[in-house]
C-alpha cells in the first residue's frame, strides 16, 4: 500500500512539474508574439513617416522642375 502511495505521489509530482514547464513555455511564446507585434507596428509607423517625407520631397522637386521649364 505504501508503495502505491509513493508511486501515485511521484506521478502527481512529475505531472505538476511538466504542467508548470508547459505553462512557462506558453507564457514565453506569448511574450515573443507581443514583441513581434510591437516591432511590426514600429516598422509600419517608420515606413509611413518615410513615405510621407518622400511625397513631400517629390512634390517640392516637381515644383522646382516645373517652374524652370516655364
UniProtKB/Swiss-Prot annotation:
GO biological process terms, semicolon-separated: defense response to bacterium; defense response to fungus; killing of cells of another organism
Which keywords has UniProt assigned to this entry? Amidation, Amphibian defense peptide, Antibiotic, Antimicrobial, Cleavage on pair of basic residues, Fungicide, Hemagglutinin, Secreted, Signal
Write down any Gene Ontology CC term.
Answer: extracellular region
Q: Which residues carry this modification: Phenylalanine amide?
A: 65
Which segment of the chain is annotated as a signal peptide? Answer: 1-22
Q: Which Pfam families does the UniProt entry name for this protein?
A: FSAP_sig_propep
Please tell me whether the keyword Hydrolase is annotated for this protein: no
The source's superkingdom equals: Eukaryota
Location within or outside the cell: Secreted
| Pro-sequence residue ranges | 23-42, 66-70
Q: In which tissues is it expressed?
A: Expressed by the skin glands.
First-listed, main subcellular location of the protein, grouped into a coarse class: secreted
User: Does this entry carry the keyword Amino-acid biosynthesis?
Assistant: no
Q: Which family does it belong to?
A: Belongs to the frog skin active peptide (FSAP) family. Cruzioseptin subfamily.
**What is the recorded function of this protein according to its Swiss-Prot or TrEMBL entry?**
Has antimicrobial activity against Gram-negative bacterium E.coli (MIC=15.11 uM), against Gram-positive bacterium S.aureus (MIC=3.77 uM) and against fungus C.albicans (MIC=3.77 uM). At higher concentrations also has a bactericidal and fungicidal effect. Has hemagglutinating activity against horse erythrocytes.
Q: What is this protein called?
A: Cruzioseptin-1
UniProt organism field: Cruziohyla calcarifer (Splendid leaf frog)
